Amino acid sequence: LKLKDILGKIKVILSHLNK
């Protein structure tokens, strides 16, 4: 996995947790 892909997944997970 590329760093960009990992960061993208992290952002998605954080966005779901913030809801």
UniProtKB/Swiss-Prot annotation:
Keywords: Antibiotic, Antimicrobial, Fungicide, G-protein coupled receptor impairing toxin, Immunity, Innate immunity, Mast cell degranulation, Secreted, Toxin. Coiled coil: none annotated. It is found in: Secreted. One of its GO terms (cellular component) is extracellular region. GO terms for molecular function: toxin activity. The keyword Secreted applies. Signal peptide: none annotated. GO terms for biological process: defense response to bacterium; defense response to fungus; innate immune response; killing of cells of another organism. It comes from the Eukaryota. Expressed by the venom gland. Its main location: secreted. Mast cell degranulating peptide. May also display antibacterial and antifungal activities. Its mast cell degranulation activity may be related to the activation of G-protein coupled receptors in mast cells as well as interaction with other proteins located in cell endosomal membranes in the mast cells. Belongs to the MCD family. Bombolitin subfamily. This is Bombolitin-7.
